Structure formats: C-alpha cells, structure tokens
Curated annotation (Swiss-Prot):
Gene: abr2
Residues the record lists as binding Cu cation 2: H77, H119
Protein name: Laccase abr2
Disrupted gene: phenotype observed: Changes the gray-green conidial pigment to a brown color and reduces the ornamentation of conidia. Reduces overall laccase activity only during sporulation, but not during vegetative growth. Causes enhanced insect mortality compared to the parent strain in a wax moth Galleria mellonella infection model, probably through exacerbated immune response of the wax moth.
Expression induction: Expression is up-regulated upon hyphal competency and drastically increased during conidiation. Expression is controlled by brlA, the master regulator of conidiophore development, and is responsive to the copper level in the medium.
Pfam families in the cross-refs: Cu-oxidase, Cu-oxidase_2, Cu-oxidase_3
Family classification: Belongs to the multicopper oxidase family.
Xref: CDD domains: CuRO_1_Abr2_like (cd13850), CuRO_2_Abr2_like (cd13876), CuRO_3_Abr2_like (cd13898)
Organism: Aspergillus fumigatus (strain ATCC MYA-4609 / CBS 101355 / FGSC A1100 / Af293)
C-alpha cells in the first residue's frame, strides 16, 4: 500500500507521558500517487509515512533505517529540540548523513503540543515523498481556547475530544520527475521552474487537464499583467522575463512534459469520515508542498482556526486557509450539515500555476445526499462569492497571550535575492549550499570550527533577543520575487510587521516610530515567516535565544533551499552544548 489512509492517520496513542518508540524504514520503490508511476520514497511501505502520535511530555525515540540508494536525514519540523539540538536532523549541522544501509536514532522530548511533521532534510528528497505527520496531544490540564468558540460546556468537551482525535491532513504537490531530476532540469535550463503535475491530499491526487484559456481567466491580476500568452495546458506560467530575470537560459533543454504537455490520470480521492454525533471535528492541516502555496477549504463548512504552527491562537472564523510551505493550521468544524459528501479543496494560490487537489468529507450513517456540495473557492483558489472569509494571517493573537521583549540585543538585515542564475537564491548575497555540508564535521561539534568560518551565519549569545529583517531585493536580474516561506529551526519567533520599499532604518524601534502602520498590534508567534511578493518589501521578526546549538533558517521551497537560500543560526555560542562524535554518527 503506497498511501497512508485517513483513518490510520488518526491512530491512538498512550494517554500519559511515556517513552514512545517508532521505527521508520525508508525504501526506494515504484509508486503512483496520482496514477502515474515513478520511483519514490516509502516509509514503512507507505506514503505519506506513518503518523507519529505523542502526548505532551512524552519521550520520543525514533529509529530510522536507510534502505535508499542515497544519503538521507530526518528533520522533525517545528519540534523545538530544547536541550537536544543534535536531534534536529540537518546534515552538516547536527549530524552526519545516514548513508545507505545505516541506521540512526533520534531522541527528543515532546515539550510542546500541537501539529508538526517529519521530512527529509538532505537534497530534494521531500519531492520524492519522504514525509509524514506528527501530532502531540496537549496535556489534559492545558488551557485551550475552545470557550472562545462556544461557551456551552458540552461543546467544549466535544471540541477537546475532536482535537485529540483530529484528522491529520497532509497537503503536498507532486511531480513526475524525481527531486534530483527536477533540480538537474533547473541547472541545465537556467530557469527557476515551479510547475507541478498534481496536488495531493494524504498522498492521493490526479492529473487534471483543462483548456489553457479557461485556466488563464483564473490568473490573479498581478501575474496576468506579465503574461504575454496563455498558461500552458498544465496551468503553469510560461518562462517569461519578468519572472525569470535577466539571466542566460536554455529553453531547448527543458524536459518534455515538465512545463507543458498534460496527460490526465486519476486515483481514488482520500475520504475523511466524520460522525455528526460527535458534534465537532478537528482537521490538522500540514503543508508538505515543495513548490505550491495551497489554499484549503471544506465545502459548506466554516472553520474555526485555533492553532498555528503548533501553538494555540484566539480562534478565527474562516472559510479558507492559505498554507505556505511547511506551515500548519488546526481548525474546528461544526458537524451540523445534512449527510452528504463534501469536497475538501486544496488549490494553488495561483501565483505560478492554476492547479487543485481534492478529497471528500463524508458523514457517517444515514442516507447520503447526492447533490454536489457548494464551494467557497474555485479551481484557481478564487473566492466564489463576496461572502467568503479567507483567514487573515496577520491577525492570529497567541492564546494565552505572549509577547516578545520590547527591545532586542542584536539586529540584522538580510538581503534576499538571486545569485548566479534564475534558479539560484540566497538569504544574504551568498549561496548556502546544503550539499557542501555533507562532507564536513557537523557544526554542533564546535561553533568555532574553521570549516564554518566563512559560512553564511548569524552568531548569538544565550538569553538574548535578536531582530532579523528580510529585505527583498528587486533588480534587472530579479524583477519579481515569489513569496519566500522562511522556516526557523528550534524555537518559534514573533512576526513583528511587514512593509513596502527599502528598510532604511537602523532598528525596529526607529522603523515603528516612522511607519507604525507597518507593524502588527499583536505579533504573530510561529516558526515560518513568509515574505510579501509585491515588489520591494521587508519582513521583520524577533526571537529569543534559549536553545544553544546550530540551527537552520531557510526558505522552505525545496528548490530554493537546495540552490542556496539558507543560513546558520549559531545560537548561544557562550553556552554551547557538549556533544561527542558518536552521538551524531549513524551506525
């Protein structure tokens, strides 16, 4: 079986803190998640990988055995790794690569609650299917925000139960090329390629082929303005100069079928079964997408968003939620509709391709109505009416309230842009290539190692607050930038604000005094911060250094990280953890 069924993703776990063991066996086999066969990665013989279910406070021991024909490692995305930085899963920073035939054990404590995921952190193996969900159930006495949705005690009890038994929903894009083939295509053509074949929901999807003119009508106005033709039959933007910049390109080397040449195929959709007797259902959405920004909705079912990146927020009502790469949102849904089949839709935001994936939410028991459900969004992610409410991602107040320090101890501006071609990206003018780290002694052994003297990095002291401003650079070589979902390993940080133009100030304080409208009244607390694609813009964050070790800060678009868009946070160098080589060496 090549997929993980929706029912299995809700597997039960022990109800009290314990030591919980999981084994993940990685194999390279032929699969067809969207009806087209290709080689891919399976975890324990399935795709996506099995769910890791824990209770808050549990000790997780996860044994990974690599039967793949290449090196790998596993990162537990969003897990803070407090006091276990050697378990972060980044080759060259926290461990040596797990070579073919080797095994490696990750051990960490589930200090937090919420929705996370695990995935490959070597090369472009996410694009080959190495990922699976993680859910940590909150301790029974943890304060939850459900009373802000309903003050009915029965409703609150039902919502707490729904959270514990939530439906884990992995949203991803899928390509007929392997990850390494995709990266090779960019290197040989010089193009920044972003076309996918399918959108998958829990490992199932189809290839849909529509009329290019019909798809072009769904293109958002900013992208429509730069089109000099229609979209391709796969719904992808053609390779146009405003997107690709003033670099050398080789269109004759684009692999057939990559950007155009659509051939339909189908598989059975994932089905999520809900029971109206439970009153409420919770869906834990996880974006495992490599290239796509996915907007998710459930027909005729408003959603109360109550958790973002593994942290409660004051619940927000929304009909659709946009997920950038690596983000997680948990929602509560009232089960008060007639028994029927309701579409779950995951549509690309439309910036680089018009494409969607689908699943079905069905009510258990009773006669099922055959009428089609009414959507909130269309195939191109556009709202179907003026009444549709998208989630406002700038208004996500943490629950309970939490705020950053009023002043930082350190301040950095990073200049985001291209380096040597359309497809090579950087966080600050130089390429940070993960592939170059594989042969080096991992940085966790010593922050002063000469191998990392010239690496792109930020060095901090423990118990300090750090401000980082991400400045998008616009030039002839980069006339337009896509949104960059910048994921911070280790602990979360605060999104302070965003603005247009250049960040011409020497501090956040100075910027707030000059442009108060650019800053959020309540900073958003999360582990992924997405830049605005609207020309020359900046995004400001603040985080607390409280977990010494080497951690990545990087764009979570797989192709962007692999081409150089990352840097090292050498956090807490004054109290660096003592680590021995055998702790981080696979066997």
């Amino acid at each position: 079986m090549w997929y993980q069924s929706a029912s299995l993703l809700g597997v039960a776990a022990v109800a009290q803190a314990a030591t919980v063991h999981y084994s993940l066996d990685l194999t390279w086999e032929t699969g067809s998640p969207n009806g087209v066969s290709r080689e891919m990665i399976f975890v324990n013989g399935q795709f996506p990988g099995p769910a890791i279910i824990l209770n808050e406070g549990d000790e997780a021991i996860i044994d990974v055995t690599n039967h793949l024909p290449f090196n790998t490692s596993i990162h537990f995305h969003g897990i803070e790794q407090k006091n276990t930085p050697w378990a972060d899963g980044v080759v060259g920073l926290s461990q040596w690569a797990i070579q073919p035939g080797q095994s490696y054990t990750y051990q960490w404590r589930a200090d937090t609650y919420g929705t996370y995921w695990y995935h490959a952190h070597d090369k472009a193996e996410i694009m080959d299917g190495l990922y699976g969900p993680v859910h940590i159930r909150p301790r029974p006495n943890r304060d939850s925000p459900f009373s802000m949705i309903s003050d009915d005690p029965a409703d609150i009890r039902a919502m707490k139960q729904a959270e514990r038994n939530g439906k884990l929903v992995m949203l991803s894009d899928w390509d007929h090329l392997t990850g390494q083939e995709y990266m090779k295509a960019m290197e040989e053509t010089g193009y920044d390629i972003f076309c996918s074949d399918s959108v998958l929901i829990n490992g199932r999807g189809s290839v849909f082929c529509h009329d290019p003119e019909e798809l072009t009508q769904m293109v958002p106005p900013p992208e429509l303005a730069i089109l000099n033709s229609s979209l391709t039959d796969k719904g992808c933007l053609p390779f146009v100069p405003p997107i690709q910049g003033n670099w050398e390109h080789h269109p004759d080397k684009v692999p057939p079928g990559l950007n155009e040449g659509c051939h339909p195929s189908t598989t059975q959709e994932t089905i999520f079964t809900v029971d109206a007797a439970h009153q409420w259902a919770s869906f834990h959405f996880i974006s495992a997408a490599s290239l796509k920004v996915l907007v998710v909705s459930i027909d005729e079912h408003p959603m109360y968003v109550y958790e973002v990146d593994g942290r409660y927020i004051e619940p927000q009502l929304a009909h659709s939620v946009k997920l950038y790469n690596g983000e997680r949102y948990s929602v509560m849904v009232k089960l008060d509709k007639e028994p029927a089949n309701y579409k779950m839709r995951a549509a690309n935001d439309g910036g680089n391709q018009i494409v969607s994936g689908f699943a079905t939410v069905t009510y258990e028991g009773g006669e099922t109505s055959q009428r089609p459900s009414q959507p909130y969004i269309d195939y191109g992610s556009r709202n179907t009416s003026a009444d549709v409410i998208p989630l406002d991602t700038n208004h996500l107040p943490p629950y309970p309230a939490i705020s950053p320090a009023s002043e930082p101890d350190d301040f950095h501006i990073l200049m985001l842009g291209r380096t040597n071609s359309s497809w090579e990206w950087s966080l600050d003018g130089a390429a940070f290539l993960p592939s170059n780290l594989a042969a080096l002694p991992p940085a966790i052994l010593s922050p002063q190692a000469p191998e990392f003297a010239d690496a792109l990095k930020i060095t901090t002291r423990n118990d300090t607050w750090v401000d980082i401003v991400f400045q998008l650079v616009v030039s002839e070589t980069t006339p337009i930038q896509p949104p960059h979902p910048l994921h911070k390993h280790s602990n979360k940080g605060f999104l302070l604000g965003t603005g247009h133009g250049k960040f011409n100030w020497t501090s956040i304080k100075e910027a707030k005094e000059a442009s108060p409208e650019s800053f959020l009244e309540t900073p958003v607390y999360r582990d992924t911060f997405t830049t605005s694609p609207q020309g020359e813009t900046w995004t400001a964050i603040r985080y607390h250094v409280e977990n010494p070790g080497p951690f990545l800060l990087h764009c979570h678009m797989t192709t962007h990280l692999q081409s150089g868009m990352g840097l090292i946070l050498m956090d807490g160098v004054d109290v660096w953890p003592e680590v021995y080589a055998d702790m981080i060496t696979p066997m």
